[in-house]
Amino acid sequence: MSKMGSLMLSRARCLLELRSALFFVKRESQDINNVRQSLGVYGRSFMTSSRMDKPSMSNKPREQMYGLGNMTAVQEPIPENSLKTVTLDQAQTAASTVTGLHPIYMDFQATSPLDYRVLDSMLPFFTGIYGNPHSRTHAYGWEAEKAVENARQEIASVINADPREIIFTSGATESNNAILKGVARFYKSRKKHLVSVQTEHKCVLDSLRALQEEGFEVTFLPVQTNGLINLDELRDAIRPDTVCVSVMAVNNEIGVCQPLEEIGKICRQKKVFFHSDAAQGYGKIDIDVNRMNIDLMSISAHKIYGPKGIGAAYVRRRPRVRLEPLISGGGQERGLRSGTLAPSQVVGFGTAARICKEEMKYDYAHISKLSQRLIDGLLAIPYTSLNGDPKSRYPGCVNISFNYVEGESLLMGLKNIALSSGSACTSASLEPSYVLRAIGQSDENAHSSIRFGIGRFTTEAEIDYAIENVSRQVSFLRNMSPLWDLVQEGVDLSTIEWSQH
């Protein structure tokens, strides 16, 4: 069979499979428009490739694709030439969203879906290019090493770093452990004090507590009610024996962005190292390690639509920062992290980083627009409030308190929306969020808070669906609550002394 005949047969088969999937959804939901809207999600992210990758796939500018022009993304019709790339699995996945079998995803702080462009870049390294990147005696190793170094360059360019300053790890948790423990142990003969913040990620807090058990002193700075630190308190906390200050870029629960540039200036003046956990900020907001005087940084791939299981530590070379390695072995990654790299993961990370850099302004504008729509809709519900600073924040993380409602009950009632009441790393605990407690929220308000994540593939239809369903569920739960009856009668609950919770 000729190449053209084979292509036509393949396209016909895909169209037949898509038609079957759409028939299944029509029978279940009787609403083809919803299916087209749901498929629009895949149309933007998967069926239509980036102009930089495959110009022939789409001639529409990203502004229109993300709803930044006259047409919103959910209203965009499916291009005819895109149907040939839709598989049955993709169609059924999209279809299952509108039939209630697969919830809408709004937990982007926990993880993000793998961008299909990232997957495409990874596939050759599972079977075809399978060499060990550390094998330097044959072509298989050279080819894998070249791919790894290209990815290292792409990852470094996002934060204006030297590629030699990027050390690959298994993720941000390992990077935080390696950096904090490594820098403290290397300089312990001269400096035994570190400074951090009460609202840091749990892996940072636990790493610092482990160092306390080794004899180090740690100062945990409080935050203001908006979630930001007081720079004067930071300046006063730094001592002559302080080795490192660790402040996260974007908080994973309330989305506040700390003033990295101002913190970096203080640390440089005081001659202490500045570390930032940027897992939630890398590739999403502008971060320049040189302009901000950042010496150490932790980043992760799966927060930026890359694969899970791969991350990196940025370690400045000039002025040089020394670390005592956590993992010993073959001396890979300049002796700081031994172990064979997985080229497929590294390449996926590099592709995700490149896409984030190229499309950051489009993603940020798209997410900001949807974030404001979500906030306006949810704050229209009585007795609700936004947690964290309303201006200095990443718009993709929206944390709302719904007074007189238990957050766990609200989550259980929203089965068609994938949400979280806080960090995925502590979601198994029923204790109130330590981040919300740190900004002054009561136990009751902390328990009533929900975190909404907005990402690259979120649509206006999903935002409106979330607003409608959250409003309905909050009203339902409040009508069941005796506390709500007291509030409706004008009783100030803060004046009541409860014998038990």
From Swiss-Prot:
It catalyses: (sulfur carrier)-H + L-cysteine = (sulfur carrier)-SH + L-alanine. Gene3D superfamilies: Aspartate Aminotransferase, domain 1 (3.90.1150.10), Type I PLP-dependent aspartate aminotransferase-like (Major domain) (3.40.640.10). InterPro entries: Aminotrans_V_dom (IPR000192), Aminotrans_V_PyrdxlP_BS (IPR020578), Cys_deSase_IscS (IPR010240), PyrdxlP-dep_Trfase (IPR015424), PyrdxlP-dep_Trfase_major (IPR015421), PyrdxlP-dep_Trfase_small (IPR015422). It is found in: Mitochondrion. The modification N6-(pyridoxal phosphate)lysine is found at K303. The active site is at C425 (cysteine persulfide intermediate). SUPFAM superfamilies: PLP-dependent transferases (SSF53383). Pyridoxal 5'-phosphate binds at A172, T173, N252, Q280, S300, A301, H302, T340. Belongs to the class-V pyridoxal-phosphate-dependent aminotransferase family. NifS/IscS subfamily. GO terms for biological process: [2Fe-2S] cluster assembly; iron-sulfur cluster assembly; tRNA wobble position uridine thiolation. It is an enzyme of class 2 (transferase). PROSITE patterns: AA_TRANSFER_CLASS_5. The lineage of its organism: Eukaryota, Fungi, Dikarya, Ascomycota, Taphrinomycotina. It comes from Schizosaccharomyces pombe (strain 972 / ATCC 24843) (Fission yeast). Its cofactor is pyridoxal 5'-phosphate. Catalyzes the removal of elemental sulfur from cysteine to produce alanine. It supplies the inorganic sulfur for iron-sulfur (Fe-S) clusters. Plays a role in both tRNA-processing and mitochondrial metabolism. Involved in the 2-thio-modification of both 5-carboxymethylaminomethyl-2-thiouridine in mitochondrial tRNAs and 5-methoxycarbonylmethyl-2-thiouridine (mcm5s2U) in cytoplasmic tRNAs. Its EC number is 2.8.1.7. Transmembrane segments: none annotated. Keywords: Iron, Iron-sulfur, Metal-binding, Mitochondrion, Pyridoxal phosphate, Transferase, Transit peptide. One of its GO terms (cellular component) is mitochondrion. [2Fe-2S] cluster binds at C425. This is Probable cysteine desulfurase, mitochondrial. GO terms for molecular function: cysteine desulfurase activity; iron-sulfur cluster binding; metal ion binding; pyridoxal phosphate binding.
